[in-house]
Amino acid sequence: MLSTHKLDMDISGSLNQYMNICRDAFAGSAAKLNISFKSAIIETLLLFMVIPRKINFTQLERYGTRCEQCYRQTFTKEFDWIRYNMELMNTLFDRNDRKAIAIDPSYISKSGKHTPWIGYFWSGCAGQAKRGLEILGVGAIDIDKRDCVMLKAEQTPDTITLDNVGCTLIDWYLKVLERIKDRLLEVSNYVVADAYFSKATFAKGLDSMGFHLVSRLRDDANLMYIHDGQPTGKRGRPKVHGDKIDFKHLDYTKIQEIETNNEDGKLYTLIAYSQAMKRKIRLVIWINKKGKHKLYFSTDINMSGRDVIDFYRTRFQIEFCYRDAKQFTGLYHSQARDIRRLDFAFNASFTAINAAKIMMKENSIPFSMEALKSLMFNSYLLDRFFKLSGIKPNSRIKDKLVKELIDIAAYQAA
């Protein structure tokens, strides 16, 4: 159980610390923002972490210090979320850690006839296309810490809009990355994505931006050994590829085993040629005790097999960002019909989670995001009560209240 002196703060201390984390992230931003806009963003991020249940403009007015119209106007303004979140990332991650860019589209439940870009998108939970919205989340993953910071969320146009501009989903995802590639390359030149993105067009698009792709292939992918023989001198085109890889009868003279403590299977790596990707790849083969296999790859053939599997497995940390944003900071809650307000709400939801992770790290808080939100909510209500009532409580009473708040949060985490 977390002791009171561990946080070393009064009732408003946890709130002030959270706001200071949000305020410090502006230090690395080159853009000049007026004080009023900065203050509005900091308060909005705090409220996203404080407000229970549904988070919308009405709730922001109810819990905040501004009117509803002020929040509506704030949500229409442009803000460099990726630069801001990169500052938060630098606080949370160590400079020398292995990092990569993780991308993952996610279905957002939404109804209404006038919501911009509403349509049918694939829902992994439902296993089918459902009516709603989709956002492409772009995050930075720390392979050594097994954590993720969401950098940017971009809404995906519906199929009608994409068809009108002659664009496919893959083309759109590449355009999103193209717009922010300079910032992303500051973090890493590796992009990690799920099997949907293991397409030649996507890998080629990343190549043109200076990225390598780390992903997974279909289990029945057509892969070939690299031909390492000498030219025969015969007429005709020289042999480029070797034999097709038979995963039930691997040629162990052409592959290397990766040491692993996992007794459930074995890992092998080699450079292979992929017919689907139309290129050489660094391939990692995982075979379990039953003989079934999974295929992972990187378009960087100089990447080690160990890194390929570590990078891909860490990709799942972005799923936890989605989970926390959906459960605690209202990723699904925005009822706006303005694409700018939707964009602001999506990104504020993820950024509030990023700041919370830093707060948990600074205080060595061992419990969950749910318990931290409970602590923030209780602290906010008490702080608001004392400020509005004009009461200056005895310091002993305040310390007792702080201990009770922390104990409640720790109890919920148990």
Positions of predicted regions on the chain:
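Active-site-proximal, Lys/Arg-enriched surface segment
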Residues: 47, 73-146, 264-271
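Single, function-defining residue in the core of a domain
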Residues: 1-29, 37, 97, 110, ...
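Short, glycine/acidic-rich beta->alpha junctions
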Residues: 52, 81-84, 130, 195-198, ...
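Hydrophobic, Leu/Ile/Phe/Ala-enriched alpha-helical segments that form helix-helix packing faces
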Residues: 48, 64, 92, 177-184
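Generic structural signal for well-ordered secondary structure
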Residues: 53, 64, 68, 81-82, ...
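Short gly/ser-rich anion-binding loops that grip negatively charged ligand groups
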Residues: 50, 125-128, 163-166
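Gly/serine-rich nucleotide phosphate-binding loop at the start of the catalytic core
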Residues: 1-76, 80
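Contiguous, well-ordered alpha-helical segments that form the cores/surfaces of helical PPI scaffolds
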Residues: 43-47, 137-139, 349, 353
